[in-house]
């Protein structure tokens, strides 16, 4: 009776032949959940070969452990050590970008200075026009004051001026 229970338990935990042939994904999920001690201890080398007896069935998918390690090694080499030619090329590109940027900055500065010079000329012209107008208005004001002084003086001095003084 116990033998039947254990055999039915074993049969229920293992996938049927139809499940195995229909798709490899459920088979991989089951294999990933159960790892043997050998699979846990195995560490891939940087050369791309796995240490241990054989690669397991779960690595036979689209990206194997070797491909993964080679991809990470390739990325780390690309990031870490650049060849002298790459370094020189990168330096030359940086210098060229810097040269172009400096030239653009010089051109912007030149345009800004010419704009400022034009503005200075315009303001100087406006200032001279305003100074001329001020001078004209001051002369006109002084002339009007003089006329006002003469007209008020004539009225006072003419005949009504003595009466105005006598009444006080």
From Swiss-Prot:
Disruption phenotype: Reduced sensitivity to abscisic acid (ABA) leading to impaired ABA-mediated reduction of seed germination. Abrogated induction of DHU1 in response to UV-B. The double mutant shw1 hy5 has altered root growth, hypocotyl length and hook angle similar to the single mutant shw1 in the darkness and far red light (FR), but shorter hypocotyl in WL, red light (RL) and blue light (BL). In addition, shw1 hy5 is recued for gravitropic root growth defect observed in hy5 single mutant. The double mutant dhu1-1 hy5-215 phenotype resemble that of the single mutant hy5-215. GO terms for biological process: abscisic acid-activated signaling pathway; gibberellic acid mediated signaling pathway; positive gravitropism; positive regulation of anthocyanin metabolic process; positive regulation of circadian rhythm; positive regulation of flavonoid biosynthetic process; positive regulation of transcription by RNA polymerase II; red or far-red light signaling pathway. It comes from the Eukaryota. Transcription factor that promotes photomorphogenesis in light. Acts downstream of the light receptor network and directly affects transcription of light-induced genes. Specifically involved in the blue light specific pathway, suggesting that it participates in transmission of cryptochromes (CRY1 and CRY2) signals to downstream responses. In darkness, its degradation prevents the activation of light-induced genes. Involved in responses to cold conditions probably by modulating the expression of several genes and triggering anthocyanin biosynthesis. This is Transcription factor HY5. Residues 116-144 are annotated as: Leucine-zipper. PANTHER family: TRANSCRIPTIONAL ACTIVATOR HAC1. SMART domains: BRLZ. The keyword Metal-binding does not apply. GO terms for cellular component: nucleus; protein-DNA complex. Belongs to the bZIP family. Residues 28-44 have a biased composition (Basic and acidic residues). The modification Phosphoserine is found at residue 36. GO terms for molecular function: DNA binding; DNA-binding transcription factor activity; DNA-binding transcription factor activity, RNA polymerase II-specific; double-stranded DNA binding; transcription cis-regulatory region binding. It holds the Pfam family bZIP_1. Homodimer; homodimerizes via the leucine-zipper domains. Heterodimer; heterodimerizes with HYH via the leucine-zipper domains. Interacts with COP1 WD40 domain. Interacts with BBX21, BBX24/STO and BBX25/STH. Interacts with SPL7. Binds to SHW1 in the nucleus. Interacts with HDA15 in the nucleus. Interacts with PFD4 in the nucleus and at low temperature (e.g. at 4 degrees Celsius). Its main location: nucleus. Residues 88-151 form the bZIP domain. Residues 58-75 have a biased composition (Polar residues). It is found in: Nucleus. Phosphorylated by CK2. Shows a stronger interaction with COP1 when unphosphorylated. However, phosphorylation does not affect its susceptibility to be ubiquitinated. Expressed in root, hypocotyl, cotyledon, leaf, stem and floral organs. Residues 7-26 have a biased composition (Low complexity). Residues 35-46 are annotated as: Interaction with COP1. Residues 1-93, 149-168 are annotated as: Disordered.
């Amino acid at each position: 009776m116990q033998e039947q229970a254990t055999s039915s338990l074993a049969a229920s935990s293992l996938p049927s032949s139809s499940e195995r042939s229909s798709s490899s994904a459920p088979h991989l999920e089951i294999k990933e959940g159960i790892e043997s001690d050998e699979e846990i201890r195995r560490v891939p080398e940087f050369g791309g070969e796995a240490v241990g007896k054989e690669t397991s069935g779960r690595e036979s998918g689209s990206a194997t452990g070797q491909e993964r390690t080679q991809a990470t090694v390739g990325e780390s080499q690309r990031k870490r050590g650049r060849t002298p030619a790459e370094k020189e090329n990168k330096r030359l590109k940086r210098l060229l970008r810097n040269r172009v940027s400096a030239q653009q900055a010089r051109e912007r500065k030149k345009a800004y200075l010419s704009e400022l010079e034009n503005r200075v000329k315009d303001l100087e012209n406006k200032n001279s026009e305003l100074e001329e107008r001020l001078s004209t208005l001051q002369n006109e004001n002084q002339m009007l004051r003089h006329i006002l002084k003469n007209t008020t003086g004539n009225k006072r001095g003419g005949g009504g001026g003595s009466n105005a003084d006598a009444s006080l």
